[in-house]
Amino acid sequence: MVEIVEEPDDHQSSSTGAGSSGSSSAPPPPPPPAYSSISQYVSANTMECVLFAARVLTVFFALNYMIPFIGLVPAHSAYYKIFAASAATFALRLHTRIQGQFALNAQFIQRLIIEDSFHYLVYSVVFLMAAPVSMAALPVTIYAALHACTFMTKILRETGHTSSIIPKLEQFTAHQTQNALGIIACSEIFLVPLLVSLIFSGKGSLLLPFAYYRFLSLRYASRRNPSTRQAFAQMRGSLQNVAMSSSCPRPISSLIYRAIDFISARAPPVM
């Protein structure tokens, strides 16, 4: 899922050779835009534009949920629309990743499981059918915002626009992507105790933590996005430092080590 990089431009400027003065001081002319207008880009890249629209809707509904006084969509309705738009986004993204090749065999299922888009499609469907948990909206909203910013810079550059906002957006995504991925990974981990608490409060199904555990296992094993593994490693290091501290009571230290061993024993291999 972590493809927050701009694709290189395949178009190269051609040299004419006629009237060349041989002067090294003149800068080369900028390459012509790949598309003459935004409408032309949309016609040539329809799926990318549909994904962009779905991501913008995800962010829009998230803002309506997190800032209720906007008032365009009721907060309760906006919450579930976040995950509906997110599920549509990841379903379309998964379709493009597997290139529409569907088969009922073990090889196809294995290919499906390793796709990050499949992980977040499962995530979106799980929370679409569960009681509202505000933190659950954070990962899909951040992903939608990052990908939307990346798409905006791409379409503006490829249609010849020279707005000053383009380098600012590129700089923002380049500098904040790793921080955003870390926030996403931590929020996904911290959701576990919240989902367990839903069961004791009578708002959650017994199947919810098990379904979410499967999602978290897939994220941990992801070969394209190591953020979840890194977050677990950082938390493990922090807890070990606490357990080794002389001020930590021995029963607490023992409990921490047992918890670390319990979780580490269930860590899946990288796919």
From Swiss-Prot:
Any one Gene Ontology cellular component term annotated for this protein: endoplasmic reticulum
GO biological process: endoplasmic reticulum tubular network organization; membrane organization
Leader sequence residues: none
Compartments where found: Membrane
Domain of life: Eukaryota
Listed Pfam families: TMEM33_Pom33
InterPro entries linked: PER33/POM33_regulator (IPR051645), TMEM33/Pom33 (IPR005344)
Keywords: Membrane, Transmembrane, Transmembrane helix
Regions crossing the membrane: 56-76, 125-145, 180-200
Cross-referenced PANTHER family: TRANSMEMBRANE PROTEIN 33
Entry protein name: Transmembrane protein 33 homolog
Native organism: Caenorhabditis elegans
